[in-house]
Amino acid sequence: MSSVSQARSLGKYFLLMDNILVVMGFYMVFPLISIRFVDQLGWTALLVGIALGLRQFIQQGLGIFGGAFADKLGAKPMIITGMLMRALGFIFMGIADKPWLLWVSCILSALGGTLFDPPRTALVMKLTRPWERGRFYSLLMIQDSTCAMVGALLGSWLLQYNFKLVCLAGALLFLFAAILNAWLLPAYRISNAQTSMLEGIRRVLYDQRFVTYVFTLTGYYILSVQVMLILPIRVNEVAGQLAAVRWTYAIEAALSLSLLYPIARWSEKRFSLENRFMAGLTIMLLSIIPIGMIHNLQVLFLLIGIFYTGSIIAEPARETLGASLADNRARGSYMGFSRLGLALGGAIGYSGGGWLYDMGNQLDIPQLPWVMLGMIGLITLLGFYRQFHQHHYQTYSXYLSGTTKNNSYKQ
């Protein structure tokens, strides 16, 4: 094995190890925020939704600046600083007894994510070849689902004793991840060329095709973020016990472990990235509409499983499509900007989802948030259909050959 290939291989193993800590730390805390502050403390879903939306919007909305800093300074200092800031945010969350304290903790967590997320994503692009990238994203998703389940199980177990323990455990995982990155992560440069911050940002903003794709993702994320807000609340309502919330993540993990990689391998040779993404989005929107009408826990879990199946189909295609559209001369800036759709979708999805949930309860129309989410999904699907057919996106076969829209793939 050549030294370059060995470096790539070791780098990918480190990314997988690092991802375990990051995902477990996140899911140990965030899925339980709505349970803690809405169900246990009696806050409105809108109030908690604003906090979660604020975290999402700041982290993803400022991602282009985090990515631009990483293009300039390298990945390592940004990742370490961001993880330490996320740990501090979790400590503040553990003592939050007023809305402003929860918001401060979410802002700190968001700023940490702004610093470490774009360079980590750009490292995946740097360390994987185009033809293996889709499969590596699938492996990361399998790992995400498994670690999310384990993190949520540990968090819900600790919640029986004290929410402070939940937040402390999450903070310790991010602290450990920061130490590992300081010790083991090489000082990678994530872009192919020496690019100034302003030049990297300019490249992204003038790339109309990429910008359009990112903003259209807003509707997709409005649907997907509900697994962190009103979906756990709905499961808790139907089941009448907190333990049932854990099973939603167990379902996701089981489906990911059994289906994600086989589906990715099978579909990548038969369908375009665009069609795979739209098929997954279609399944998600069709499964989310009836949730408010269901009062049987088994049927609810079935719909959740179908929703996750749609996500399993859509997510690897979305990640790979976004990477194929990025300019390798400014990887960090592109990957940072790519999170803007999640920023907008998260802010609208959390605050809007919480508001719709409260309105549905006030009007005694529990179906309201779910039907509206389905309509948003349909509009998004139509937007992607028009976009993909108008702009003639780069085909998957061209992507596998290592050619991007801006330049040949270079490491």
Swiss-Prot record:
Residues passing through the membrane, by range: 13-33, 45-65, 73-95, 99-116, 139-159, 165-185, 213-233, 243-263, 288-308, 340-360, 365-385
Keywords: Cell membrane, Membrane, Transmembrane, Transmembrane helix, Transport
Keyword DNA repair: no
GO molecular function, one term: transmembrane transporter activity
Entry annotated with the keyword Transmembrane helix: yes
Cellular compartment(s): Cell membrane
SUPFAM superfamilies per the UniProt record, alphabetical: MFS general substrate transporter
Record GO cellular component, one term: plasma membrane
Pfam families: MFS_1
Domain of life: Bacteria
Topology within the bilayer: Multi-pass membrane protein
Principal location: membrane
Family: Belongs to the major facilitator superfamily. DHA1 family. MdtH (TC 2.A.1.2.21) subfamily.
Protein name as catalogued: Multidrug resistance protein MdtH
Species whose genome carries this gene: Baumannia cicadellinicola subsp. Homalodisca coagulata
Lineage summary: Bacteria, Pseudomonadati, Pseudomonadota, Gammaproteobacteria, Candidatus Palibaumannia
